[in-house]
From Swiss-Prot:
The protein's name: Elongation factor Ts
Keywords: Cytoplasm, Elongation factor, Protein biosynthesis
GO molecular function: translation elongation factor activity
Keyword Transit peptide attached: no
SUPFAM superfamilies for this protein: Elongation factor Ts (EF-Ts), dimerisation domain, UBA-like
Family designation: Belongs to the EF-Ts family.
Pfam families the UniProt entry points to: EF_TS (PF00889)
Length: 307
């Protein structure tokens, strides 16, 4: 009989997952030391220890269905740029983005509990654990997002070998081959300019009031009279919209056009209105605090681990 205390002791000794510890103990008839060896042989003990390390490298991967009606984007992290270009790591990332596109789940946590698309005998989380053990680095499926459309297209753009990824939803009542090209232009715009919002309606009240207060204080600090401060604030808010709302931004390919004007021109050519309904932009490692270590200290640490 495998007790909870036995599982707890093995988990504390190896850092492996609870179910992995229970399986190992069952396999070894409750022998703690043999169970430790089993976990080490499977690479699970080492993988669990690595899971405490910061994974801020990696890639952003996207998947678009053949009919361009469904798309997904994921961020899959590892510790070094060396592993981020490893064939096994990239293959897993691409499979995960494909799985996300056709799955009913909406979060990375839910996707981890699903059967793996390329081998349904395993869960996604277990496949990742196996690769951690094989490549010797912590990995983390950080986030996923999906878009779908009935009339229009979904497309993606990857920049810098997976450093930045974007998926865009373009709506149009008329099916036209040129829609894919237009959507790609918009996706490239999102990658280049990193807009915070789709349009003015997407700017929440708290953000808007915060920006207004900042501009108001700036204007007063410049010694402007109270009566002109409000006009200055509104002028700066309009500038904020133009910089941070996708449809109001100047098009990076032609600064004479805003994205709205570009879409209007393309709508005339196609003979139907084209609108951007949504976008998702991921940049690998954004928001992750990565510990900076002295190179000599890092080498010494690795040498000590090898003793």
């Amino acid at each position: 009989m495998i007790s909870a205390k036995m599982v707890k002791d093995l988990r504390e000794k190896t850092g492996a997952g609870m179910m992995d510890c229970k399986k190992a103990l069952t396999e070894c008839d409750g022998d703690l030391e043999k169970a430790v060896e089993v976990l080490r042989e499977k690479g699970l003990a080492a993988a669990a220890k690595k899971s405490g390390r910061v994974a801020a490298e990696g890639i952003v991967s996207t998947y678009i269905s053949e009919d361009m009606k469904n798309g997904s984007i994921i961020e899959f992290n590892c510790e070094t740029d060396f592993v981020s270009v490893n064939e096994l790591f990239v293959e897993l990332a691409n499979n995960l983005s494909k799985q996300a596109a056709f799955s009913n789940v909406s979060t990375a946590e839910e996707l981890l509990e699903e059967k793996y698309i390329a081998d349904e005998s395993k869960l996604v989380k277990d496949v990742i654990t196996e690769l951690i053990a094989k490549l010797g680095e912590n990995m983390n499926l950080r986030r996923i997002a999906k878009l779908s459309v009935d009339k229009g297209v979904i497309t993606s753009y990857i920049h810098g070998g997976g450093r930045i990824g974007v998926i865009v939803k373009l709506a149009c009542e008329k099916e036209d081959a040129k829609l894919a090209e237009i959507a790609k232009d918009v996706a490239m715009q999102v990658a280049a300019t990193n807009p915070l919002f789709l349009n003015r309606d997407g700017v929440d009240t708290d953000t808007l009031e915060k920006e207004k207060e900042i501009y108001r204080v700036q204007a007063l600090n410049e010694g402007k009279p109270e009566k002109v401060v409000e006009k200055m604030v509104m002028g700066r808010i309009n500038k904020y919209y133009k910089e941070n709302c996708l449809v109001e931004q100047l098009w990076v390919k032609n600064g004479d056009y805003t994205i709205t004007k570009y879409l209007q021109e393309q709508s005339k050519e196609i003979g139907a209105d084209i609108t951007v309904e949504a976008f998702v932009r991921y940049e690998k490692g954004e928001g992750i605090e990565k510990k900076e270590e002295d190179f000599a200290e890092e080498v010494q640490r690795q040498m000590n681990q090898g003793k």
